[in-house]
């Protein structure tokens, strides 16, 4: 978080936090309630978000759920939805933290290579994350959707 980064930087230079760093921390703290509210709304609506995003993805990419597709059959479709749920959870972590560090450290590094080795169409996973953004945006206020949208975009971009 901005708090940890500011402290680590100041300590590395054996100095007190600067006025600018303190202002950034104050802004981070004051926006905390908003970030927590957004994360709570996404958490409370996670099943709806994942299901509707999956429906949108499978409608847009029927090849994924057709015979021979990576999400063909009930078990593989459930695996695909599980992955979307995982990315939604990571997104809520990023929102709460106010940056993408938890997303990077917990679940994005190495993902592209893993999906390639499994033969999973990475663009379909990224499209699923974008579909979750669309569903979440319909649940959130415009301001909250803009805040959360950056995290969905980050994950989709990291997968693409």
From Swiss-Prot:
Contains one covalently linked phycocyanobilin chromophore. Signal peptide: none annotated. The keyword Thylakoid applies. The keyword Thylakoid applies. The modification N4-methylasparagine is found at residue 70. GO terms for cellular component: phycobilisome; plasma membrane-derived thylakoid membrane. One of its GO terms (biological process) is photosynthesis. It is found in: Cellular thylakoid membrane. It is a peripheral membrane protein. (2R,3E)-phycocyanobilin binds at residue 80. Keywords: Antenna complex, Bile pigment, Chromophore, Electron transport, Membrane, Methylation, Photosynthesis, Phycobilisome, Thylakoid, Transport. Light-harvesting photosynthetic bile pigment-protein from the phycobiliprotein complex. Allophycocyanin has a maximum absorption at approximately 650 nanometers. Component of the phycobilisome. Heterodimer of an alpha and a beta chain. Belongs to the phycobiliprotein family. This is Allophycocyanin alpha chain. It comes from Mastigocladus laminosus (Fischerella sp.).
């Amino acid at each position: 978080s901005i708090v940890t980064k500011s402290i680590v930087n100041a300590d590395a230079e054996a100095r007190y936090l600067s006025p600018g760093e303190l202002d950034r921390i104050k802004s981070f703290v004051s926006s905390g309630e908003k970030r927590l509210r957004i994360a709570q709304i996404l958490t409370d609506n996670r099943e709806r978000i994942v299901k509707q995003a999956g429906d949108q993805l499978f409608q847009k990419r029927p090849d994924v759920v057709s015979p021979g597709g990576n999400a063909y059959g009930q078990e593989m479709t459930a695996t695909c939805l599980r992955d979307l749920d995982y990315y939604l959870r990571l997104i809520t972590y990023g929102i709460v933290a106010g940056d993408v560090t938890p997303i990077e450290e917990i679940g994005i590094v190495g993902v592209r290579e893993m999906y390639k080795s499994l033969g999973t169409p990475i663009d379909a996973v990224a499209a699923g994350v974008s579909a979750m953004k669309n569903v979440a945006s319909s649940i959130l206020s415009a301001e909250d959707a803009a805040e959360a949208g950056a995290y969905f975009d980050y994950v989709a971009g990291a997968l693409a």
